[in-house]
């Protein structure tokens, strides 16, 4: 199946889902604010061979990145019915370069060889930057990237994340600005320059309640 046909079919499964996966029920809106938003600022070399999508929800951005760039994705979310639905739909569409797991990011460190395992991590609409860095950095290789999709309010979050970056072994690499139907969007790119201390991520809920300051 051609890329664009796969994208079309997958968007249709999202907007017609019996469970609330995305905030769109109109194809054109979903196409722009889910697919284009996921892929426009991204480059194949950002992802490497294998990426993790933390808090994937309806498979965004992970499914679209796997289709567009061919990288292998590991998609996790704490809501099992969402992961199960996305997994089943991807199997129906024969999107084969994806794995799925229903789990909290804080618990992944105890499940298999995932610490500093992935070439990159992506996350969209999960939480503030300091929190998401704690949930992603432990699973990215030194030299890998963490790519976070944000709106115009990212600057304040970034300012509050300086200590988290130092503590987790990541640094800001660049900010890519792009526009979707007149709305400014930003891809915040971090590079992992050092190993993340073993104590991270902390226990479930702590990164959200008490971000590293």
Where are these regions (language model features)?
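Class I SAM-dependent transferase core
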Residues: 1-48, 52, 81, 87-98
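Conserved SAM-binding loop of SAM-dependent methyltransferases across substrates and taxa
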Residues: 58-70
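Conserved SAM-binding motif I beta-strand of class I
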Residues: 72-77
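Conserved SAM/SAH-binding loop
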Residues: 102-109
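A short acidic, Gly/Pro-enriched loop at the edge of an enzyme's catalytic core
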Residues: 109-120
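A short SAM/SAH-binding and catalytic strip from SAM-dependent methyltransferases
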Residues: 119-131, 138, 152
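Helix-to-beta-strand junctions that scaffold the AdoMet/dcAdoMet cofactor pocket
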Residues: 140-142
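SAM/dcSAM-binding transferase cores
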Residues: 160-213
